[in-house]
Amino acid sequence: MELNELQQQRLAKLERLRAAGIDPYPPRTRRTHTIGFVLASFDQLMERGEQVTVAGRIVGARRILGKLAFAHIEDESGRIQIWLSRGDIGDEWFDRFRDDLDTFDIVEATGTLRRTQRGEPSVFVERLGVLAKSLNPPPEKWHGLSDIEERHRQRYLDLIVNPEVRDVFRTRAKIVSTMRRFLDERGFLEVETPTLQPIYGGASARPFITHHNQLKQDLYLRIAVELYLKRLIVGGFERVYEISKVFRNEGVDRTHNPEFTMMECYQAYADYNDMMRLVEDLYRTLALEVAGSTTIVFQGHTIDFGPAWQRVSIPTAIAARTGIDILELTELEPLQRAIRAVGLKVDLKPSWGKQVDEIFSVYVQPELIQPTFVIDHPVALSPLAKRRPDQPLLVERFEPIVAGMEVGNAFTELNDPLDQEQRFLEQGRAYDAGDDEAQQMDIDFLNALMYGMPPTGGLGIGIDRTVMLFTDQPSIREVILFPHMRPRD
């Protein structure tokens, strides 16, 4: 690895430390308190004259004023000033602090607590130690890394210099733990299903393919966990859920990353109306837990999770917005003629169902700001959902939409094995016609359904998009620690 000039200067300082018998990367520390604890208990510790040892990264500039020096160090819990006097710490370590230590080095400082003349809580250092010498200097503006792509490529540096980014991921962890507790308290059992699958299914998406050398078998990274969880419902578990990574070989944009986190849950003897109530309760709980209120702000919109969510029917909304009655135009060519006739600016799609979805996505969904259940999806887009008894072109399905963004998907699950087989066959014909997102025939899943699956409601929630909402982040990359990035040129 070639070092630039600044790295070489830091390497020379590291070598000086080693030459003096100082290990710049010792195996352990003598830390007695976190910085956050010291700050919270500062006056009591100071009154007792208690000696503390804190540890953290040097942040900001070090200042040397004759026989005095000071800097700030930071650990995960907080930031505190350390104050060094040549008389207290001795010539060797005072000079070493001045000459061999740098911003971003990780140190430990032992001393007593006092406030400066300006009242700033400080550790007056009696002993200093090096815990990790940083060979990389901070960015030019140490207090912030502003290049978005570099922030995502070097998330470790982003976390060092932008404390608010750490807060986003603390909130993410809180959302996941709250969601898990919410489901546990309602009797759902957390389970684990295969990541490597011989047949991919449960969503309309292109998979990532890998190969098992010993079995000489192609396998797929899961695009969803639905079909395995429904097998468990067949097996007698009545409420199950899984929080897991799923993988879809698709584009990268503001709301899509090829690797993302989903929560899927299934409840026997329930339908999509029960899942709607579950979603309302879940997001209300998340809002109260994360924001302390049912109201949040996302990208300038005030979102209220307190009231019941509105319901919007796809055919009704499209008719109101565009004048097109999709239930009267149930073939692709007449629908596309109507699109051209009224001058809709949408991409033309290869199937009726996808064309309906395109119209809705462009002309209706962006206007759905308050929490909304979008219902009445075409059966052609929903091969795993139960048909509406009164309208066989549509299914009992909803998508929760917040601030114009889809955050999940839910059905009354199709449990008729004969109907399911026909849906799979239709998907196979679509695949043969060029739809590489069509779902695959899964004989074993059909066999499971033939043993009988009770009426079941199923729900999938995108964790990443949910975190976007509750942290007011404009892009999914801001809520994934290590998002997928294009290779450097």
Swiss-Prot record:
Q: Where in the cell is it found?
A: Cytoplasm
Reactions catalysed according to its record: tRNA(Lys) + L-lysine + ATP = L-lysyl-tRNA(Lys) + AMP + diphosphate
Which PROSITE patterns does the entry mention? AA_TRNA_LIGASE_II (PS50862)
UniProt key word Nucleotide-binding: yes
The cofactor note reads: Binds 3 Mg(2+) ions per subunit.
Gene Ontology BP terms: lysyl-tRNA aminoacylation
GO CC terms of this entry: cytosol
Q: Which GO terms describe its molecular function?
A: ATP binding; lysine-tRNA ligase activity; magnesium ion binding; tRNA binding
Renumbered to this chain, the signal peptide range is none
Q: What is its EC number?
A: 6.1.1.6
Main location group:
cytoplasm
Q: Which family does it belong to?
A: Belongs to the class-II aminoacyl-tRNA synthetase family.
Q: How does it assemble?
A: Homodimer.
Protein name (Swiss-Prot/TrEMBL): Lysine--tRNA ligase
Q: Which organism is it from?
A: Roseiflexus sp. (strain RS-1)
* Biological classification of the source: Bacteria, Bacillati, Chloroflexota, Chloroflexia, Chloroflexales
